[in-house]
């Protein structure tokens, strides 16, 4: 696809689909204290105590009213690859990170517990138990950093994408953030953007891994390469066809629009779209739409880029724009680059073998609520989400029964 106006719809579910690719070990994508805690627990005899960890946010970043779950599929893949290779064991031994007993445990490490969580694309609020990890303390504790690393970034991007998609009022939004982030983060951002409602990406690696439709045609450098703008546009149309999207603001926008339409018609077709990347986008969109219509190019679409966020997109709502390309603000969470999620122990096995609720008490808003949580969504008769109910219960049967009694749809699924 070479058009900036994608025609292929993509769902949050399809963003979790990937091809089989070799995955390197993820076990050292963690903080050192995860392993030193493991060592201490092995020495104190508490490492095998059954434990329940929850991943949640104490509050939402800024003044935002909801978050969007993303990263679940990536985390499950990362946990599958969470094994310690001989080279990694050697590194931990040489640097004295942990002792030999702990290294023996890590050599054979495979997560064998259970994980429940919200499906990708679900909205959430402060306190929502997005992920519940149950296993021994040893095997569940050391997943903390990895889980937070993936969820904090992916949820931040998905929330930003959702806000932008809402502001766009059904006009398609496309990820252009590859050059504005770490090369691997950009791939994750492309995936999360689709969970949040975007319909395509410029990132080819994301297209390969996740089946996301890819878009892209040319930059200003392609126009500058040629001796004239006419030659550049003719070359692009000859290569990509008249349905391509041409960037028309390298020199004069009005002249660029006229030349782009002419180049497409010389090839026997109508121009697919023009892209605006500078200036007052609202004013320019009105001018360009009027010019295209006057030229008879009524089917030619207008796509805009240039440091867009949800506020800029909302400001363009009345303008005759057909699609948006978003880069920097998307991959940085539109000013909130982390979802501010935490991973806390909420229940653990006591010395007598019974499960006990545990919680952190402290000032400064960093306390936690003990006990395993079960969450459900209550819908109106019209199917609109009205509220989220969270109940604390150590028993799955009791937790689900409480949700059912309130008429709430359970949000956590076995992953």
Predicted regions and their residues:
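Buried, small/hydrophobic-residue-enriched core segments of structured protein domains
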Residues: 2-49, 59-61, 97, 103-112, ...
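Gly/Ser/Thr/Ala-enriched C-terminal appendages of enzymes
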Residues: 2-49, 63, 294-295, 300, ...
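Extended boundary segments
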Residues: 40-98, 166
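A residue-level signal for beta-strand positions that form part of recognition/binding surfaces
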Residues: 52-54, 112, 173, 342, ...
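A structural detector for beta-sheet-dominated domains
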Residues: 56-58, 118, 392, 414
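An N-terminal, globular interaction/scaffold subdomain
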Residues: 76-82, 117-120, 124
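Short, conserved beta-strand edge motifs with alternating hydrophobic and charged residues
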Residues: 247, 275, 303-305, 325-327
């Amino acid at each position: 696809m070479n058009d900036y106006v994608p025609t292929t719809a993509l769902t949050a579910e399809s963003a979790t689909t990937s091809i089989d690719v070799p995955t390197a070990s993820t076990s050292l994508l963690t903080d050192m204290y995860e392993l030193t805690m493991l060592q201490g627990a092995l020495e104190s005899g508490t490492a095998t105590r059954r434990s329940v960890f929850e991943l949640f946010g104490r509050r939402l970043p800024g003044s935002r009213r909801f978050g969007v779950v993303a990263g679940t599929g990536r985390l499950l893949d990362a946990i599958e690859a969470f094994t310690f290779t001989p080279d990694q064991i050697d590194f931990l031994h040489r640097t004295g990170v942990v002792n030999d007993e702990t290294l023996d445990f890590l050599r054979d490490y495979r997560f064998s517990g259970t994980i429940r969580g919200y499906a990708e694309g679900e909205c959430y609020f402060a306190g929502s138990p997005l992920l519940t990890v149950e296993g021994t303390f040893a095997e569940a504790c050391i997943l903390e950093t990895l889980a937070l690393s993936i969820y904090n970034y992916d949820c931040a991007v998905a929330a930003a994408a959702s806000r932008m998609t809402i502001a766009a009022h059904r006009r398609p939004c496309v990820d252009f953030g590859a050059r504005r982030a770490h090369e691997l983060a950009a791939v994750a951002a492309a995936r999360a953007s689709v969970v949040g409602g975007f319909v395509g990406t410029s990132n080819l690696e994301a297209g390969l891994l996740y089946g996301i439709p890819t878009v892209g045609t040319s930059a200003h450098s392609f126009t500058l390469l040629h001796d004239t703008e006419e030659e550049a546009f003719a070359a692009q149309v000859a290569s990509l066809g008249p349905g391509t999207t041409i960037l028309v603001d390298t020199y004069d926008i009005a002249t660029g629009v006229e030349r782009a339409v002419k180049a497409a018609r010389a090839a026997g077709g109508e121009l697919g779209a023009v892209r605006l990347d500078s200036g007052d986008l609202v004013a320019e969109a009105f001018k360009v739409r009027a010019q295209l219509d006057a030229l008879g190019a009524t089917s030619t679409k207008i796509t805009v880029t240039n440091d867009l966020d949800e506020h800029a997109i909302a400001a363009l709502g009345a303008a005759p724009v057909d699609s948006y390309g978003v880069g920097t603000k998307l991959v940085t969470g539109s000013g909130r680059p982390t979802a501010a999620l935490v991973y806390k122990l909420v229940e653990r096995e006591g010395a007598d073998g019974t499960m006990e609720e545990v919680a952190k008490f402290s000032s400064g808003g960093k306390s936690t609520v003990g006990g395993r949580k079960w969450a459900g969504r209550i819908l109106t008769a019209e199917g609109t989400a009205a509220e989220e109910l969270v109940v604390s219960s150590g028993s799955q049967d009791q937790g689900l029964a409480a949700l059912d009694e309130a008429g709430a749809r359970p949000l956590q699924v076995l992953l």
